[in-house]
């Protein structure tokens, strides 16, 4: 091109400003799906931990497409989702200025891993969180019932307080993640009764999501620190002979007014942003107790979802898990929030039935020639390291 272009679309979206570090590492749910009272009572979100990615093979079910009934290879993400424990219920009332918290009722007993969430330094603390509140169940149980009755009478939105069981994961962290999750379906009284029945009980992920469902993933993205404008905004590099650097913006604005407009691309923080990734297809909701949760109808090999040697920088997934199409925000070990979609997606991609033919469980550390240890032993034979001294 021998002349300069006099028009070009701007680089980078202004819809995600400010590009700064997220305040909390857990993904916040700012909106929940619309409540339908005719449906049964159920949670609308769940917390999990990103374990890693794998590869799947399936037949595409898309009539009219040239790829219909043909094999496709796709990337998928494994999210470790140990059962969550319900420890409280919150009632909200509608006001002209939005929802307002009415009252909160906690369970009688809270585990140590969730009580750690209320302390900055657990070891130097007196560890007395909720000891006074728990005494109400012995001395003044009537007050707890009164608060639940208030929620039934005045509240229009009911949410439970549930925490993860991080001790069941390979992570070294001992502090559980606590979140408010909205209950949809049924009347307000049904919601409160459901929450009370599940106090101090586990809720599994298969009671929230199912296969072939489209869900949203809310998480904090991978952080990259302070980055230059070319990497951060994708601006064009300047010509080779440019004075004082190439990876810059040539003109950041007029001389007067003597300030830089907020729309101008600048260097700064890149990554570790709070993001919501929508419409991820659920390929599988697996059970941790199933020793063949990595097998399919076409691949009858008895294997789990874990690759040989475990997921790199995570370990083995021994709990229930969710297999999602594509990649999701965040790094391995990071807590992610899985939420039901805010709207009903009727596209062919959303309504098609998924039938997995093969899930890759080869080692992620090296060439990955074998799917199971038995397959490796059959090919390699007994190795010297396997012999007992």
From Swiss-Prot:
What GO molecular function annotation could you give as one example from this UniProt entry? structural constituent of ribosome
User: GO cellular-component terms in the record?
Assistant: cell surface; cytosolic large ribosomal subunit; small-subunit processome
The UniProt transmembrane annotation reads none
Q: What PROSITE patterns does the record tag this protein with?
A: RIBOSOMAL_L3
* Sorted UniProt keywords: Cytoplasm, Ribonucleoprotein, Ribosomal protein
Ribonucleoprotein among keywords: yes
Q: Which InterPro entries match?
A: L3_arc_euk, Ribosomal_L3_dom_3_arc_sf, Ribosomal_uL3, Ribosomal_uL3_CS, Transl_B-barrel_sf
Q: Where in the cell is it found?
A: Cytoplasm
Q: Does the keyword Ion transport apply?
A: no
Q: Which Gene Ontology terms describe the biological processes this protein takes part in?
A: maintenance of translational fidelity; ribosomal large subunit assembly; rRNA processing; translation; translational elongation
Summary of subunit composition and partner proteins:
Component of the large ribosomal subunit. Mature ribosomes consist of a small (40S) and a large (60S) subunit. The 40S subunit contains about 32 different proteins and 1 molecule of RNA (18S). The 60S subunit contains 45 different proteins and 3 molecules of RNA (25S, 5.8S and 5S).
User: What does this gene product do?
Assistant: Component of the ribosome, a large ribonucleoprotein complex responsible for the synthesis of proteins in the cell. The small ribosomal subunit (SSU) binds messenger RNAs (mRNAs) and translates the encoded message by selecting cognate aminoacyl-transfer RNA (tRNA) molecules. The large subunit (LSU) contains the ribosomal catalytic site termed the peptidyl transferase center (PTC), which catalyzes the formation of peptide bonds, thereby polymerizing the amino acids delivered by tRNAs into a polypeptide chain.
Q: What family does the entry list? A: Belongs to the universal ribosomal protein uL3 family.
User: What's the protein name?
Assistant: Large ribosomal subunit protein uL3
Q: Which species does the entry assign this protein to?
A: Candida albicans (strain SC5314 / ATCC MYA-2876)
């Amino acid at each position: 091109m021998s002349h300069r272009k006099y028009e070009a679309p701007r680089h980078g979206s202004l819809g995600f400003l400010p590009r700064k570090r997220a305040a909390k590492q857990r993904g916040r749910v700012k909106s929940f799906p619309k409540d339908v009272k005719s449906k049964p009572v159920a949670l609308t979100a769940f917390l999990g931990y990103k374990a890693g990615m794998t590869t799947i093979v399936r037949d595409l079910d898309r009539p009219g497409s040239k790829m219909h009934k043909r094999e496709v290879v796709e990337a998928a993400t494994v999210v470790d989702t140990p059962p969550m424990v319900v420890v409280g219920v919150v009632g909200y009332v509608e006001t002209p200025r939005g929802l307002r918290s009415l009252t909160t009722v906690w369970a009688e007993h809270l585990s140590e891993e969730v009580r750690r969430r209320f302390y900055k330094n657990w070891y130097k603390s007196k560890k007395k969180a909720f000891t006074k509140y728990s005494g109400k169940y012995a001395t003044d149980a009537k007050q707890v019932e009164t608060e639940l009755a208030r929620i039934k009478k005045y509240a229009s939105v009911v949410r439970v307080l549930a925490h993860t069981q991080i001790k069941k994961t390979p992570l070294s962290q001992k502090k559980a993640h606590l979140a408010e999750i909205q209950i949809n379906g049924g009347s307000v009284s049904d919601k409160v009764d459901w929450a009370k029945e599940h106090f101090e009980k586990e809720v599994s992920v298969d009671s929230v999501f199912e296969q072939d469902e489209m869900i949203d993933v809310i998480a904090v993205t991978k952080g990259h620190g302070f980055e230059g404008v070319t990497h951060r905004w994708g601006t064009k590099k300047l010509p080779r002979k440019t004075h004082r650097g190439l990876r810059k913006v040539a003109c950041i604005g007029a001389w007067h007014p003597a300030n830089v407009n907020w729309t101008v691309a600048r260097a700064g923080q890149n990554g570790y942003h709070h993001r919501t990734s929508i419409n991820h297809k659920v390929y599988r909701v697996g059970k941790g107790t199933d020793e063949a949760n990595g097998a399919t109808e076409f691949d009858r090999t008895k294997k789990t979802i874990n690759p040989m040697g475990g997921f790199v920088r995570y370990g083995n997934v021994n709990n229930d898990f969710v297999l999602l199409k594509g990649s999701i925000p965040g790094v391995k070990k990071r807590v992610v929030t899985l939420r039901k979609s805010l709207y009903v997606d009727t596209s062919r991609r959303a309504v098609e039935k998924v039938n997995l033919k093969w899930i890759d469980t080869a080692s992620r550390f090296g060439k990955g020639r074998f799917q199971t240890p038995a397959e490796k032993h059959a090919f390699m034979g007994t190795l010297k390291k396997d012999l007992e001294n």
